[in-house]
């Protein structure tokens, strides 16, 4: 179902992404969906997930990209800062099942994007509010982070990465340990097999030599 309302994309933070996707505004007040509809895959493409992705997959993609493009990891990169902002804005929509459903149906309005948030319905709905992106800590001259005394919160990448990727890192660590143990076991078995083969061959030649000597003496 196509959207029936005009979206004020020039006022929306998500407008920049649709503009990059080649959808110019139809007027100075916004994009009217009566004439055209916005792309329903642009936000998914931005996060690098298919439109059929689960909420868990969307969340994982958001954490991964927000970590990679965080301005503190890319000082002085306007492109990274812009990508970080777009990823955060995309997750504000796709991270909410209610806003995502509206987006998929072409019903997402500017009011939805500018609102304080989706109000919970009377019936229980498993739709936790999407987490905000990691805080952006402006850097002081010289590239160093501003100190806590400046009134800003320093961003701890180690804590962020451990909080969202700790379980995955632990699984990978256990997997590497199992692979290493299996490799050593196979090497030990191969060494034992080689040692046994050498012993067997040596024994065979000794027996053959003794038989030859015994037959020689008999003759």
Swiss-Prot record:
- Residue ranges annotated as transmembrane are 202-218
Which superkingdom does the taxonomy of this entry point to? Answer: Eukaryota
Q: What happens when the gene is disrupted?
A: Mice are smaller and have a decreased weight. Neocortical projection neurons display morphological defects reminiscent of Williams-Beuren syndrome (WBS) in human, characterized by less complex dendritic architecture and a smaller corpus callosum. Mitochondria show decreased ATP production. Mice do not show significant systemic metabolic defects.
Keywords carried by this UniProt record = ATP synthesis, Chaperone, Membrane, Mitochondrion, Mitochondrion inner membrane, Transit peptide, Transmembrane, Transmembrane helix
What is the extent of the transit peptide?
1-38
- Annotated GO CC locations: mitochondrial inner membrane; mitochondrion
Cellular compartments annotated: Mitochondrion inner membrane
The J domain sits at: 42-107
What does the record say about tissue specificity? In brain, expressed in gray matter structures.
Matching CDD domains: DnaJ (cd06257)
Q: How does this polypeptide assemble, per the annotation?
A: Associates with the ATP synthase complex. Interacts with MT-ATP6; interaction is direct. Interacts with ATP5MC2; interaction is direct.
Protein name as catalogued: DnaJ homolog subfamily C member 30, mitochondrial
The organism of origin for this protein? Mus musculus (Mouse)
UniProt lists the gene as Dnajc30
């Amino acid at each position: 179902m196509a959207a029936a309302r005009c979206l004020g994309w020039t006022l929306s933070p998500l407008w920049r992404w649709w503009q990059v996707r080649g959808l110019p505004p139809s007027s100075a007040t916004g994009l009217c969906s009566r004439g055209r509809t916005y792309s329903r895959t642009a936000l998914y493409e931005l996060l690098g997930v298919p439109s059929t992705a689960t909420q868990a997959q969307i969340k994982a993609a958001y954490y991964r990209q927000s970590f990679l493009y965080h301005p503190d990891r890319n000082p002085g990169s306007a492109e990274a800062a812009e990508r970080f902002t777009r990823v955060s804005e995309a997750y504000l929509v796709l991270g909410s099942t209610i806003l995502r459903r509206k987006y998929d149906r072409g019903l997402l309005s500017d009011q939805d994007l500018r609102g304080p948030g989706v109000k919970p319905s009377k019936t229980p709905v498993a739709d936790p509010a999407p987490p905000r992106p990691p805080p952006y800590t402006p850097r002081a001259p010289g590239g160093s982070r501003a100190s806590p005394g400046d009134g800003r919160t320093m961003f701890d990448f180690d804590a962020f990465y451990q909080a969202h990727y700790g379980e995955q890192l632990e699984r990978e660590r256990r997997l590497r340990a199992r692979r290493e143990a299996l490799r050593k076991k196979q090497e030990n078995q191969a060494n034992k097999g080689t040692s046994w083969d050498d012993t067997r061959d040596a024994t065979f030649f000794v027996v053959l030599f003794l038989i030859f000597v015994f037959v020689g003496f008999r003759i």
